[in-house]
Amino acid sequence: MTNPEDPIDWRALAEEIGADPNRGGDAIARRAITSLLGDEAMRRAVDWYVEGRPAAEHASSVLRLLRPDAARSRCLEIYRTDPAPERRHLAVELFRVVARAEDLPLVGDLLADPDPAVQLWGMGVLDRLLWDGHVDADDAEPFLRMAERRPNPKVREKHTDLRAHLEPHE
């Protein structure tokens, strides 16, 4: 995190995040804010949420807006390595709001997880990727077919709901 007393060198920041210093936009702004806050702050925000600390939803909202790589990685690290089921569930729940299009293949891993709650949050990831416009129905199709075949009735129910929303309205 930068010292609040120091002015921001916007040109250096643009170079740091790989952006043309003469261009702007929401995606560039999110990367710049993430860079100013730092990866460690993003990882700590994930931990804050997973631990259920006060204002956890505030941390989630900031992470949802920024969708930083460090938060996505930390969510997956907790999901893959933490022995506590509740922490794994919360990590996947949070991953749902920070996931991006390139994370779509992870939906298959989540649906294949032996934990029914992780499977259901995997459907939440797919749902969010669809409705936030990160992926389209064609991209989601293999995972919808996978969900349809899962023995978990809640996953199949979520599959049915997603299919209904994806059908063209007449």
What name fits each language-model region?
Residues 2-3, 15-36, 47-68, 86-100, ...:
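Structural detector for internal amphipathic alpha-helices that build alpha-solenoid repeat scaffolds
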Residues 4-11, 35-48, 68-80, 100-112, ...:
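Amphipathic alpha-helical scaffolding segments comprising HEAT/armadillo-like alpha-solenoid repeats
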Residues 52, 83-84, 114-115, 151-152:
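Short inter-helical turns and helix N-cap capping residues of alpha-solenoid HEAT/ARM repeat scaffolds
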